Amino acid sequence: IQMLDNLAKKLGVVLYVSGEESPEQIKNRSERVGISGTNIQVLSSGNINKIFELAESLQPKFIAFDSIQTLRDSSSQGAQGSINQIRDCGYKIINYAKSKSIPVLITGHVTKDGNLAGPKLLEHMVDTVLYMEGDKYMEMRILRVAKNRFGPEQEIGLFQMSFNGLKSIDNLSLSINVNGNIGSGRTLVPIVEGSRC
């Protein structure tokens, strides 16, 4: 929601389609992180055709879908979140975005293995795939680039999760809390569950 607020300030109207949260939940979260959201239009629906009808009347400059697993196309087979539904809704979203020349953000769930849930085809249809990963011991979030058609894939973004939302970490050294036990002979090494970074 913070990203959508920043985009709305720069671009104009953005549409936030949420099948995950109700408008009341989104409003509460927005107020908690200090977002007025005057140019953010919220639609709590999973009906892909209804979403595009509203988009036609609003003419948003950006659309965020949260999440692809909650969308449903009545002309497609399968239950909401099924491979067919994810594939067909993904096609419709991408075709709509191309026809209107607007960027879209599609959030999705990951499997226990850490892969994008749904058909692998979805990853091939989009320009960029990002993973937001949590940390077990700190309130840090890492945004990793898994695919980037227009730039490098070796980039990460570091964020601190707080009551007021995500805050960018510009200097990791200053953000790591070692409980004040910095002394001679101590070494701080960045590792992820035993793997070398």
Predicted segments, located by residue:
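Conserved inter-motif catalytic segment of the P-loop NTP-binding fold
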Residues: Q2-K92
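A generic structural signal for well-ordered alpha-helical segments
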Residues: L7, A55, A97, L122-E123
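Short glycine-/polar-rich loops that comprise or flank the Walker A/P-loop
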Residues: L11-G12, T38, S101-I102, H124-T128, ...
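Short regulatory helix/loop adjacent to the ATP-binding pocket of P-loop NTPases
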Residues: S30, N115-M125
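Conserved P-loop NTPase
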Residues: S36, E56-F62, Q69-L71, G134-C197
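Short loop/edge segments at beta-strand edges and connector loops
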Residues: S44-G46, G108, D170
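Long C-terminal interaction/binding lobes of large macromolecular proteins
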Residues: F65-T70, A79, A97, V104-I106, ...
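Substrate-engagement module of ASCE P-loop NTPases
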Residues: N84-H109, M125-K136
